[in-house]
């Protein structure tokens, strides 16, 4: 085979043309110390705050401390194979997690990797875990209700879409139970849910997932797990990862609900990281920016207006507002709400549901303290029928608690006080509700109407729950159309009032319980 001289010269010219003289510079450093998941790196000149740092063995870290002659980074995952002298490289990327519909029904870790054994997740989109919250102009006021299905909350402490409502109480007071009931109640409403478990036992997380599957709620839920056995770094970033997954739905004109269970453990993890990074400790040994830790997370829960949704979707979605509702959970020690983290989160959120150990142990569940619980913006979003019927319930309960304490010392009470105490006892009994049995708007309306109109006054306190159960069964079978109309419109008018009066009178005349 003979080669033509012109062919050879053409070939050489092609090769020369394709030759790339570009120089790629990459910042590299050396690990100088490695203790408790904290890496000190010397020589990383161009690293950003929060940037991903690459270590040998496909391991990554996150740069948190940028100092004059070294960088302090936290390793995400196991670090047993790393040692002093290893190379660390800048990636130029901020930590991202997969987002989108593909994650629904799955259990993932804080980095978005599946841990439920159901195969890989085919996620097309990724989102940075840290984002700036929507500005004032992008937001819209809270005006749509988010029904939790719990009488005590929807009637007295209503939650709106886009609100941040804190659930606070000691351990074993039913905080997680309220959040799980709220997730179960979103079935069929189109609201997507994200449950972020931080520092929980793996058995507890598995139990939550099983309950969600049993009640058909896993189809619209993503579970993000950073259990107690995970590193402090993963417990610290898990809530931000969950928030990024929720923002995907909000920014496309949908509604999402995120539960952080719980932010106390995230604050502990952040304190641990900060102390290992040798940041100066402050009150209760927390670092100075622990308020910012929670405020930048919770401010991302919001309701954004249609113009912002249209801008974010580049015109694909028009005329729809999006919302991300947050239910952060905080665990108190012996009911002390004046501790550092509880006061911080109370001041950031739009209200709190305060759960008491004494009420829980007395069998009043959910153990909501009506006097200390408040919803600062949810009233504007409350369903009309519940707002009308539940208005006096909160006052009745708060006054009853006050009088009940006083009545222990007084032997003879006047008629008005005695009536108020008796009414309070019945309302307290009525507010009790079993776990995993959320109620519809119409069912709540029936129970509240019966209490308001005095239909419980001649019922023994111990029989109130039986009366309510029997009444609900009767309404379901005999007055299905009335219930359907209340659920459909959420309105309260003379026709509905007359219908409820007639139905309850007929029930009391013909039924025993």
Curated annotation (Swiss-Prot):
The organism of origin for this protein: Methylococcus capsulatus (strain ATCC 33009 / NCIMB 11132 / Bath)
Listed PROSITE patterns: ATPASE_ALPHA_BETA (PS00152)
GO cellular component entries: plasma membrane; proton-transporting ATP synthase complex
EC number: 7.1.2.2
A Pfam family assignment: ATP-synt_ab
NCBIfam families tied to this protein: atpA, PRK13343.1
Catalysed transformations (reactions): ATP + H2O + 4 H(+)(in) = ADP + phosphate + 5 H(+)(out)
Cellular location(s): Cell inner membrane
Keyword Ribonucleoprotein: no
Higher taxonomy: Bacteria, Pseudomonadati, Pseudomonadota, Gammaproteobacteria, Methylococcales
CDD domains attached to this UniProt entry: ATP-synt_F1_alpha_C (cd18113), ATP-synt_F1_alpha_N (cd18116), F1-ATPase_alpha_CD (cd01132)
PANTHER family for the chain: ATP SYNTHASE SUBUNIT ALPHA, MITOCHONDRIAL (PTHR48082:SF2)
Enzyme category, top tier: translocase
Highest taxon of the lineage: Bacteria
One MF annotation (Gene Ontology) recorded for this entry: ATP binding
Residues where ATP binds: 169-176
Protein family according to the UniProt entry: Belongs to the ATPase alpha/beta chains family.
Record membrane topology: Peripheral membrane protein
Entry-linked InterPro entries: ATP_synth_asu-like_sf, ATP_synth_asu_C, ATP_synth_asu_C_sf, ATP_synth_F1_a_nt-bd_dom, ATP_synth_F1_asu, ATPase_a/bsu_AS, ATPase_F1/V1/A1_a/bsu_N, ATPase_F1/V1/A1_a/bsu_N_sf
Name this polypeptide is given: ATP synthase subunit alpha 1
Keyword terms: ATP synthesis, ATP-binding, Cell inner membrane, Cell membrane, CF(1), Hydrogen ion transport, Ion transport, Membrane, Nucleotide-binding, Translocase, Transport
Residues the record marks as site: Required for activity: 373
């Amino acid at each position: 085979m003979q080669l033509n001289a012109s062919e050879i010269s053409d070939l050489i010219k092609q090769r020369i043309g394709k030759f790339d003289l570009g120089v790629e510079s990459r910042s590299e450093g050396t690990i100088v110390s490695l203790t408790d998941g904290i890496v000190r790196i010397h020589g990383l000149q161009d690293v950003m705050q929060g940037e991903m740092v690459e270590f040998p063995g496909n391991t990554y870290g996150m740069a948190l401390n940028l100092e004059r002659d070294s960088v302090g980074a936290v390793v995400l995952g196991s670090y047993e194979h790393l040692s002093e002298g290893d190379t660390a490289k800048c990636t130029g990327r901020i930590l991202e997690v997969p987002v989108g519909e593909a994650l629904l029904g799955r259990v993932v870790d804080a980095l978005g990797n599946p841990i439920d054994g159901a195969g890989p997740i085919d996620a097309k989109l990724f989102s940075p875990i840290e984002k700036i919250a929507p500005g004032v102009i992008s937001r819209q006021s809270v005006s749509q209700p988010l029904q939790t299905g719990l009488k005590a909350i929807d009637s007295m402490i209503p939650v709106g879409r886009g609100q941040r409502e804190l659930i606070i109480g000691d351990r074993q007071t039913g905080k997680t139970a309220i959040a799980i009931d709220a997730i179960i109640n979103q079935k069929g409403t189109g609201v997507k849910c994200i449950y972020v478990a931080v520092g929980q036992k793996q058995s507890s997380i598995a139990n939550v997932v099983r309950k969600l599957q049993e009640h058909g709620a896993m189809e619209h839920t993503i579970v993000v797990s950073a259990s107690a056995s995970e590193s402090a770094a993963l417990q610290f970033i898990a809530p931000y990862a969950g928030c990024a997954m929720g923002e995907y739905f909000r920014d496309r004109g949908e509604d999402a609900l995120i539960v952080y269970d719980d932010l106390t453990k995230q604050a502990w993890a952040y304190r641990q990281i900060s102390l290992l990074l040798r940041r100066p400790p402050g009150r209760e040994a927390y670092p100075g920016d622990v308020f910012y830790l929670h405020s930048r997370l919770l401010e991302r829960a919001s309701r954004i207006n249609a113009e912002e949704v249209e801008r974010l979707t580049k015109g694909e979605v028009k005329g729809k507002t999006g919302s991300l509702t947050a239910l952060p959970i905080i665990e108190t020690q012996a009911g002390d709400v004046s501790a550092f983290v509880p006061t911080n989160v109370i001041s950031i959120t739009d209200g709190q549901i305060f759960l008491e150990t004494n009420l829980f142990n007395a069998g009043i569940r959910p153990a909501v303290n009506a006097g200390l619980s408040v919803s600062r913006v949810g009233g504007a979003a409350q369903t009309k029928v519940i707002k009308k019927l539940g208005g006096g319930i909160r006052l009745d309960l708060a006054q009853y608690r006050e009088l009940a304490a006083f009545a222990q010392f007084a032997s003879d009470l006047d008629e008005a006080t005695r009536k108020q105490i008796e009414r309070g006892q019945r309302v307290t009994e009525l507010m009790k509700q079993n776990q995993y049995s959320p109620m519809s708007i119409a069912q709540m309306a029936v129970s509240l109407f019966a209490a308001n109109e005095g239909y419980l006054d001649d019922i023994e306190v111990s029989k109130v729950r039986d009366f309510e159960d029997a009444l609900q069964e009767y309404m379901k079978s005999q007055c299905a159309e009335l219930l359907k109309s209340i659920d459909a419109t959420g309105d309260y008018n003379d026709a509905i009032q007359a219908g409820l009066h007639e139905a309850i009178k007929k029930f009391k005349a013909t039924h025993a319980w």
